[in-house]
A protein has these predicted regions:
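Per-ARNT-Sim (PAS) sensory domains and their PAS-associated C-terminal
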Residues: 99, 103-133
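PAS/GAF/H-NOX family sensory domains and closely associated sensor/linker modules
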Residues: 76-100
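Short, low-complexity N-terminal regulatory "tails/caps" that precede and couple sensory modules
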Residues: 1-19
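PAS-family sensory domain signal
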Residues: 20-75, 169-185
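Short loop/turn elements at sensory-signaling interfaces that couple input to output
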Residues: 2-3, 132-147, 155-161
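Helix-turn-helix DNA-binding segment
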Residues: 178-198
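Histidine/lysine/aspartate-rich catalytic loop segments that bind and position anionic ligands
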Residues: 154-176
């Protein structure tokens, strides 16, 4: 059973590495995923040991109006709504803490976290995004090494951003909602820490 989970983890990792080097595959993934998405979306991949994102999908132009080459961790921090900056870090901290303390190492990559945030579009207006993140590579010690993030524009739903973060497991069909109201220091593997002080 653990061996099959490692195979699945490696397949996930290899798919995203392949997409990173084959833009036409990225287009196919976008075409398949789009009908099932709640709105227009883009995705990006981050290695916890690197300062920059390793991949950003072309569809960011349709969602936020920016070129993918301009979308860096520092730029993401710059276009976050001022009221959401602390919440973003708090929500990520709570999620990472939950995964490290409550979930076995083999199950970490089966969870995704989801919450709402606002980002400034190139036209100057803020849009509401559903932020989803899923670890795609985890060390034997349980450190998250690589994560895929998906941002979906849900502005048309007229929802308000709150302190809630949801953790959803694909294996046991469970969902946990947490109120992320504590303001704590971010752990070193949280990419928000790397650019929140810039």
């Amino acid at each position: 059973y653990p061996k099959s989970k490692n195979i699945i983890k490696n397949v996930n990792r290899d798919i995203f590495r392949f997409v990173n080097h084959k833009p036409e595959i990225s287009s196919i993934i976008d075409a398949i995923a789009h009908p099932f998405a709640a709105g227009n979306f883009y995705y990006f991949i981050h290695y916890s040991t690197h300062a920059e994102f390793s991949f950003v999908s072309d569809s960011i132009k349709n969602v936020l109006g920016y070129n993918k080459e301009d979308f860096t961790p520092g730029f993401l921090a710059k276009i976050l709504h001022p009221d959401d900056k602390n919440q973003f870090g708090d929500k990520e901290l709570i999620s990472l803490s939950f995964l490290k303390k409550q979930i076995s190492v083999n199950d970490i990559s089966s969870y995704k976290l989801a919450f709402l945030l606002r980002m400034k579009h190139a036209n100057g207006k803020y849009i509401t995004l559903l932020h989803q993140a899923r670890p795609i590579r985890v060390s034997e010690a349980g450190e998250i090494l690589e994560t895929i993030y998906v941002h979906t524009d849900i502005s048309y739903l007229n929802v308000s951003v709150d302190n809630r973060v949801s953790l959803i497991s694909k294996n046991n069909h469970s969902q946990i909602s947490i109120d992320a109201t504590k303001n704590q220091l971010l752990p070193p593997n949280c990419f928000m820490k790397n650019f929140s002080s810039r």
